[in-house]
C-alpha cells in the first residue's frame, strides 16, 4: 500500500484528554455527526476526544465520517447525513449556489502556504503563465479550484486559458505521476506528499491567494442546537491553542493517523495557522469576493450572499469562547 493510500484509508488512533466543562442542555439532539478530512484542527479534535466527552455529559453520541475533499462533505451535509463539517473556501460557495441549507459557523485562516500547484520537473513549465493550454487537475468546487482561479488571474490568464481536469486527490496524484496531467493544484498533506514525488516540482504555493477554511453546519441543526455548536467551537479553539504550543506532538499525531512520514507531517504542521474565529466583517468580505469572482466567471449559476448564511452566535456563546481562550 502506498503512503497516499495509507493516508486516505489509514486507521485512526485515539488520544483522549480530560476536560472540565458544564453539561449541555438536555434538549439537544442526541447525536452529532461530524464530517472531517485527515488534516487540520478538526483531526486534532477527533483524536484528543475532549469533544466526545463533553457531549457525552448530555447523552449526545458523537460520530465521525471521513471525506477526501470538501464538495462531497457538503453534499452529505445538505442531505442530512452529517451535521457539521470542515472545508476550504470554495465548497460552501458552490453549495449555497445550489440551494443547500447550511451556515458558516466559524473560520480558520489559510495563509496559502499549505496549498499550491505542482508540475513535472521536465514539463518546461516555469511560471504560472506557462499553464496556458495545459491540463491542470484539481477537485472541482474545492479550495484548490479557487487557488487556480486566483493564481491564473495574478498571472494575467483566465480560467478559460487552461484545460481543467476534475479529479479527487488520490486520482490526481496517480494522473500526475503517470503523466496524464501537466499540473496539479492541491492542499496539504497531499501537497507535501506530492512535493516528494520523483520528477515533481513546486510551481508556486498559494501565498498570493490567502483565504480561510470554514466549519459549517446544517442550518436546522445550528438553529436547534446552539449549545452543542458553542461547545464544538470551544473545542476547536482549545485544539488550535494546543497545536500552536505543541508542534512536534502535532506532527506525531497527524502521522499516527495518516501513515504519512513524520518528517512530511512536520512540514504540514509548520505551514498551517491554528486560530479559530466566529465570522466577522473581514472574513465575510473576503469570502464574498471569492463568491463574486466565481459568479462573474460563470462557475456558479448566480450570485450568492455570504452574510445571509453566516451563523450569528449568541452573547452567551461568544462569552464562552472568550473564557475558553483565557484558560
Which ranges hold each PLM region?
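Short, solvent-exposed loop/beta-turn-alpha elements that line the ligand-binding surface or hinge
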Residues: 53-59, 275-283, 306
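Conserved C-terminal helix/tail region of periplasmic/extracytoplasmic solute-binding proteins
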Residues: 294-327
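Pocket-lining segment of extracytoplasmic ligand-binding domains
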Residues: 90, 161-165, 170-257
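Secondary-structure end/capping motifs
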Residues: 223-301
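Small-molecule pocket liners
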Residues: 41-42, 111-117, 200-201, 211-215, ...
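Bacterial N-terminal signal peptides
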Residues: 8-20
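Short, glycine-/small- and polar/acidic-enriched structural segments
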Residues: 27-157, 165-166, 182-185
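Sec/Tat signal peptide C-region and signal peptidase I cleavage site
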Residues: 21-26
Amino acid at each position: 500500500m502506498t503512503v497516499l493510500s495509507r493516508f486516505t484509508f489509514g486507521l485512526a488512533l485515539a488520544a483522549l484528554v480530560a476536560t472540565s466543562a458544564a453539561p449541555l442542555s438536555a434538549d439537544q439532539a442526541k447525536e452529532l455527526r461530524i464530517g472531517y478530512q485527515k488534516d487540520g484542527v478538526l483531526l486534532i479534535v477527533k483524536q484528543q476526544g475532549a469533544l466526545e466527552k463533553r457531549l457525552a455529559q448530555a447523552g449526545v453520541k458523537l460520530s465521525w465520517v471521513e471525506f477526501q475533499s470538501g464538495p462531497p462533505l457538503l453534499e452529505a451535509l445538505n442531505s442530512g447525513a452529517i451535521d457539521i463539517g470542515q472545508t476550504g473556501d470554495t465548497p460552501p460557495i458552490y453549495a449555497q449556489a445550489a440551494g443547500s441549507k447550511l451556515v458558516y459557523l466559524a473560520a480558520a485562516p489559510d495563509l496559502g502556504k499549505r496549498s499550491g500547484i505542482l508540475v513535472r520537473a521536465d514539463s518546461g513549465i516555469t511560471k504560472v503563465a506557462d499553464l496556458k493550454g495545459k491540463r491542470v487537475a484539481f477537485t472541482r468546487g474545492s479550495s484548490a479550484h479557487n487557488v487556480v482561479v486566483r493564481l491564473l488571474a495574478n498571472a494575467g490568464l483566465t480560467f478559460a486559458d487552461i484545460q481543467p481536469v476534475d479529479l479527487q486527490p488520490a486520482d490526481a496524484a496517480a494522473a500526475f505521476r503517470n503523466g496524464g496531467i501537466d499540473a496539479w493544484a492541491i492542499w496539504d498533506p497531499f501537497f507535501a506528499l506530492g512535493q516528494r514525488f520523483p520528477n515533481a516540482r513546486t510551481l508556486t504555493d498559494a501565498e498570493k491567494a490567502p483565504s480561510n477554511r470554514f466549519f459549517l453546519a446544517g442550518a436546522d441543526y445550528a438553529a436547534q442546537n446552539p449549545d452543542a455548536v458553542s461547545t464544538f467551537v470551544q473545542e476547536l479553539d482549545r485544539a488550535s491553542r494546543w497545536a500552536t504550543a505543541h508542534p512536534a506532538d502535532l506532527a506525531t499525531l497527524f502521522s499516527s493517523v495518516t501513515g504519512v512520514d513524520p518528517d512530511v507531517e512536520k512540514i504540514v504542521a509548520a505551514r498551517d495557522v491554528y486560530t479559530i474565529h466566529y465570522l466577522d466583517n473581514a472574513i465575510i468580505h473576503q469570502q464574498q469576493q471569492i463568491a463574486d469572482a466565481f459568479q462573474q466567471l460563470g462557475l456558479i449559476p448566480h450570485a450568492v450572499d455570504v452574510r445571509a448564511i453566516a451563523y450569528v452566535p449568541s452573547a452567551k456563546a461568544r462569552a464562552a469562547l472568550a473564557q475558553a481562550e483565557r484558560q
